[in-house]
Amino acid sequence: VGPLHGLPISLKDNFKIKGKDSTVGFTSLVDKPADYNATLVDMLEKLGAVRYCKTNVPTAMMIAESVNNVFGRTVNPLNRKLTSGGSSGGESALIAFRGSPLGIGTDIGGSLRIPAACTGIFTLRPSHGRFTTQGCQSGLTGQEAVQSVNGPMGTTLEDITMYSKAIVDAKPWLVDPKMLPIPWREVESKEKLKIAVLWNDGVCSPTPPVTRALRQTVDKLKKAGHEVVDWDPKLHPLALDFLVSVQYDSGQNIH
């Protein structure tokens, strides 16, 4: 019996489970079952969670939708003509469809946040060193410079908080040396927050419905008493160049 006792939790395909495939969309990994559990899988079992399914991803988990040559395409349960996002799009679709009360995805550049936005659910993209990804199947084996993180996906903020506290209270730093030994802390939110809004990233112009949604959000935040400032993306290209230099083979783009 633990804090997650009896709770069904779905897992993104890259979480290795002994005896099961973790293809992450590669046909070359079909029928090559794992011979051990990912560390988080063992932790969830000790906390009482019930694992019952793994969910779809794009090949190598590197695009913002979920389609591959093993399981096909995952679509949005709210509108099957739209994507459920990626790379944790199998999780977002299942949770939005109420097929899973809580799921675990992973994220480097938006793989939790994009699917959650596409399907209207909640997620947390934590800092590195909080939730262990030890023993997971990588889509970019050997790439250690920019680390993936994992986080919960659910239909309420209370679910996200409950899961996060349970994992941190389980002291993951005792089983994964990359985890930071920082206990759970209750923090009172400030009544007034300063929030930045990105109207345009300097690369892709948002469509009118996205801009309208941003304006509506800004109006509601201001009415709630928060300070909203515009975010200038002028340094984003520099950050992207740095990312390419440390993440990709030879630090180069090849076209």
Question: Where are the predicted features?
Answer:
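Amidase signature
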Residues: 1, 166-255
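Gly/Ser-rich catalytic/binding loops embedded in alpha/beta enzyme cores
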Residues: 1-109, 224
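Short acidic, glycine/serine/threonine-rich loops at helix termini
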Residues: 21-22, 62-66, 113-118, 135-137, ...
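Amphipathic alpha-helical segments in well-structured domains
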Residues: 37, 121, 211-215
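Generic structural signal for helix capping and beta-alpha/helix-loop junctions
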Residues: 59-61, 111-112, 205, 238
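Fold-level recognition of mixed alpha/beta catalytic cores in primary-metabolism enzymes, strongest
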Residues: 65, 71, 91-192, 196, ...
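Short, basic, helix/turn surface patches
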Residues: 74-88, 128-138, 252-255
